[in-house]
């Protein structure tokens, strides 16, 4: 089983979109049992009192237009242990790469 985590700054737009689009692609190919896919943030800006904000409404709307459900997703921050837990950590941009290095 391949474990993949997409990472962006706040985990409310880009990385959740990548997570749910990839999950949809896997489902359409019948490969759900071969992958674990999730997403996280490098910051805590979208996490308040331990509770992450949901997917940003315009991002959720785009997913909904493609019949991709992201209900229940809330922002979470990447942890040092994720480097060992996941096979692939996929940052959305070069700033995410830099910020991810703080967790090593």
What does each model-found stretch correspond to?
Residues 1-85:
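Conserved active-site segments centered on acidic
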Residues 86-88, 94-104:
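Phosphate-binding/catalytic loops
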């Amino acid at each position: 089983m391949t474990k993949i985590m997409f990472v962006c700054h706040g985990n409310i737009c880009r990385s959740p979109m990548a997570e749910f689009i990839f999950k949809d692609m896997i489902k359409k190919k019948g490969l759900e049992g071969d992958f674990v896919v999730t997403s996280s943030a490098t910051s805590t800006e979208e996490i308040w009192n331990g509770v992450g904000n949901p997917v940003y409404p315009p991002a959720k709307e785009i997913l909904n237009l493609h019949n991709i459900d992201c209900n229940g997703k809330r922002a979470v921050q990447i942890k040092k242990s994720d480097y060992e837990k996941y096979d692939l950590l996929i940052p959305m941009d070069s700033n995410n790469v830099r910020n991810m290095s703080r967790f090593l």
